[in-house]
């Protein structure tokens, strides 16, 4: 079982994550995690904070000489902007200053419902934790999960497939080629022509004091048949993936495979027909069963079927606008324009990295549940035995 917790506020001293369930013997490094953290901070349309924070992870426990040792792994990322917030975010009562309270809630954020739920008269106490800054730690945890999956030939990749209504075209490209193109893109997309139009759209909404949303896609290749289960609702892998992706700030919809389009088509155009070719095993495939289409997105009945897992998520435009929306002061009940916090114009490329990370965590967790052991070597023996079984099925 793989589980993790994150802690920390956006302008606090640091962000922290504790991961439990990573087996002994996995090679991980701060340098590798930092590459993924940099990917999260990049992208066209990001805000001024990215110029301040250059995230660098520190591994504080669970790793010795470059390998996990089986105990909980602790990761932290220091907030460089903390130096400017030491008194505003101090844990000490002597620094309390009611004059700096934030009382004007921003539409679209957790500000007002959070303040009402926790009985706060300062929405700073809500917005600091609800901020997408927290996703830095989920990317760090996801980097560890991706390293684990990579040791078994499983890759997890995130892309921007739509932004401001402009769609990227895949044009029959392989998953490897998609990753190559997206890695060169400022918008994490694989369609250079669409990228140019997406950038122009971001520029136009920025000039208007507005923000832009989009759609991200995560593709998992190499996952074996049999991850997840049909036997209980909370063990269905598609349900777990949907929850993980929906938990990302500003995500308002998730679909797997053909998703919502399945509701518009007859069943004959939706379900993936099953074929068998024994020669596939001789060519290195895990099983002779295969599909010619993948409308299911690699999951049927909550269980992986051996095809690529495909998840898409809709990200709303960031609700912090430089041309603020109307709101109401929490204390005086007077109408005001909402508070403007430093923010991005478009964070869809970052959402692709975060979605990739949370999907990797869920796939790694399901993998460990299926093939679990205390060390990487033990899990590999279990996995190899399962692959032998599949070939004979």
Curated annotation (Swiss-Prot):
SUPFAM superfamilies with a match to the protein in the record: Chorismate synthase, AroC
Catalytic activity: 5-O-(1-carboxyvinyl)-3-phosphoshikimate = chorismate + phosphate
Single GO BP term: amino acid biosynthetic process
InterPro entries linked to this entry: Chorismate_synth, Chorismate_synth_AroC_sf, Chorismate_synthase_CS
GO molecular function, one term: chorismate synthase activity
Cofactor(s) the record lists: FMNH2
Enzyme type, top EC level: lyase
CDD domains named in the record: Chorismate_synthase
EC identifiers of the protein: 4.2.3.5
Gene3D superfamilies: Chorismate synthase AroC (3.60.150.10)
Amino-acid positions noted as binding FMN in the UniProt annotation, renumbered to this chain: 129-131, 249-250, 301, 316-320, 342
Cofactor binding notes: Reduced FMN (FMNH(2)).
Name of this protein: Chorismate synthase
Source organism of the structure: Geobacter metallireducens (strain ATCC 53774 / DSM 7210 / GS-15)
Gene transcribed to yield this protein: aroC
């Amino acid at each position: 079982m793989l589980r993790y917790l994150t802690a920390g506020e956006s302008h606090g001293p640091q962000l922290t994550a504790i991961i439990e369930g990573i087996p002994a013997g996995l090679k991980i490094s701060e340098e590798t995690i930092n590459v993924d953290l940099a990917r999260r901070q990049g992208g066209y349309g990001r805000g001024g904070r990215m110029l301040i924070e250059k995230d660098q992870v520190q591994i504080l426990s669970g790793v010795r000489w470059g390998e996990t040792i089986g105990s909980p792994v602790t990761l932290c990322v220091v907030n460089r902007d903390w130096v400017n917030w030491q008194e505003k975010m101090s844990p000490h009562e002597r620094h309390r200053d009611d004059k700096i309270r934030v009382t004007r809630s921003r539409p679209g954020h957790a500000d007002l419902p959070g303040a009402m739920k926790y009985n706060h008269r300062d929405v700073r106490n809500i917005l600091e934790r609800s901020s997408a800054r927290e996703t830095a730690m989920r990317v760090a945890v996801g980097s560890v999960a991706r390293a684990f999956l990579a040791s078994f030939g499983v890759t997890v990749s995130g892309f921007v497939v739509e932004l401001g209504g402009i769609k990227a075209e895949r044009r029959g490209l392989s998953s490897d080629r998609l990753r190559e193109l997206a890695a060169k893109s400022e918008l994490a997309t694989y369609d250079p022509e669409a990228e140019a139009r997406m950038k122009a759209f971001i520029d136009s909404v920025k000039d208007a004091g507005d923000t832009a949303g989009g759609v991200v896609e995560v593709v998992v290749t190499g996952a074996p048949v049999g991850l997840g289960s049909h036997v209980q609702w909370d063990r269905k892998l598609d349900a777990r993936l949907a929850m993980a992706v929906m938990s990302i700030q500003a995500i308002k919809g998730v679909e797997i495979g053909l998703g919502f389009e399945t509701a518009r088509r007859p069943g004959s155009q939706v379900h993936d027909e099953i074929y068998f070719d024994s020669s596939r095993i001789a060519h290195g495939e895990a099983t002779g069963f295969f599909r010619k289409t993948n409308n299911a997105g690699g999951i049927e009945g909550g269980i992986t079927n051996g095809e690529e897992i495909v998840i898409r998520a809709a990200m709303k435009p960031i609700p912090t606008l430089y041309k603020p929306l109307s709101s109401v002061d929490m204390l005086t009940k007077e109408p005001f324009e909402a508070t403007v916090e430093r923010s991005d114009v478009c964070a869809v490329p970052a959402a692709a990295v975060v979605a990739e990370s949370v999907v990797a965590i869920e796939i790694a967790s399901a993998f460990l549940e299926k093939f679990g052991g205390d060390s990487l070597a033990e899990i590999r023996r279990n996995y190899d035995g399962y692959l032998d079984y599949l070939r004979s099925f």
